[in-house]
Amino acid sequence: MKKEVVVIGGGIVGLSCAYSMHKLGHKVCVIEKSDGTNGTSFGNAGLISAFKKAPLSCPGVVLDTLKLMLKNQAPLKFHFGLNLKLYQWILKFMTSANAKSTHRTIALFERYGWLSIDMYHQMLKDGMDFWYKEDGLLMIYTLEESFEKKLKTCDNSGAYKILNVKETKEYMPIANDNICGSVLLTENAHVDPGEVVRSLQQYLQNAGVEFLYNEEVIDFEFKNNLIEGVITHKEKIQAETIILATGANPTLIKKTKNDFLMMGAKGYSITFKMPEELKPKTSSLFADIFMAMTPRRDTVRITSKLELNTNNALIDKEQIANMKKNLAAFTQPFEMKDAIEWCGFRPLTPNDIPYLGYDKRYKNLIHATGLGWLGITFGPAIGKIIANLSQDGANEKNADIMLFSAFFRD
């Protein structure tokens, strides 16, 4: 069976690649090992948080993380063991936590954040129906030191709105007096990620994009400097262009003789119902404990914690209890009605820079992975970049790849 473009992976990045490739007139086939109704793209916070917000690795983060570890509030939990890549990842994370690297990354976040916003607008214009709100990201601070530090970065551009405790409670009615204040980053947005994924699926299927669900790619067939065949557990598929967007699963990446400095970071979320008057008025992030709380059409979702160096796909009840405990320290008591707990793995690089671009060996293979906790933020932008790259034909001809790919970042 021969295809023009095969996208391996049906998450937000894979679907965004399929969307932009289809827009260029290509015949696209998406291969997804699951039934396409659940996955990391469904369970995340839904933040489009590219603006005026530092990456995970930034100055001071190492010391701050160690302090939070002592209180069991750290955003990262490391399962230490005999895994050399974990220590390589940590070393890169630490060396990336400098002012120069952070300044560059923030600038890139802004550039590709606006591209993602444009792509979300295009999706809505195309008739897709999903929860989408451009009403900012409320950064709530629980430590006076970090609040003062954030205030020093605010300017009069309109991108920031500084709120005291009383004003913060108007946005976050359940907040208690243990908070210090907040800053509304007005340019950010949020979506219901599940609605985005389902809308993309429906749009693409109606447009003639082929979907092979419950079909797992298990290997590749190579010939010289090309991938001659994509081998699934059902068939062999040939393709002119193959886009590998399999998220945190490194199996197929390793089949292509690559071993990216990327870890599967296990994240958690709880989705629940609460009275409308108690819901946060916009997407919010308790910045000092790295916990997001996002309003949706009928529910609210909290997300937190990233565990590194674990393959356990089961929900850790201790982590869920810890999330609730950390949130309770800064909120009034409230009921999480009809709560749904979730966990999933994100492809996290140590500096928040994804792996994008043509493979160094196989000329018809394009990589699109490594967005970590920023999949919803940058997924649509990545789809556009990858589609443009397919026209350019080489990494070096595409400025966005040269700027935003880990292949070209020290």
Curated annotation (Swiss-Prot):
Q: Which reaction does it catalyse?
A: a D-alpha-amino acid + a quinone + H2O = a 2-oxocarboxylate + a quinol + NH4(+)
**One GO location term (cellular component):** plasma membrane
Q: Which domain of life is it from?
A: Bacteria
- List locations, semicolon-separated: Cell inner membrane
**GO MF terms, alphabetically ordered:** D-amino-acid dehydrogenase activity
Q: Which cofactor does it need?
A: FAD
Q: What Enzyme Commission number(s) appear in the record?
A: 1.4.5.1
Tell me which residues bind FAD: G9, G10, G11, I12, V13, G14
Q: Which UniProt keywords apply?
A: Cell inner membrane, Cell membrane, Electron transport, FAD, Flavoprotein, Membrane, Oxidoreductase, Transport
**Pfam families associated with the record:** DAO
Q: Which InterPro entries match?
A: FAD-dep_OxRdtase, FAD/NAD-bd_sf
How does this chain sit within the bilayer? Peripheral membrane protein
The role this protein plays is:
Catalyzes the oxidative deamination of D-amino acids. Has broad substrate specificity; is mostly active on D-proline, and to a lesser extent, on several other D-amino acids such as D-alanine, D-phenylalanine and D-serine. Mediates electron transport from D-proline to coenzyme Q1 in vitro, and is involved in the electron transport chain from D-proline to the c-type cytochrome in vivo.
Entry's family note: Belongs to the DadA oxidoreductase family.
Q: PANTHER family per the record?
A: D-AMINO ACID DEHYDROGENASE (PTHR13847:SF286), SARCOSINE DEHYDROGENASE-RELATED (PTHR13847)
Name recorded for this polypeptide: D-amino acid dehydrogenase
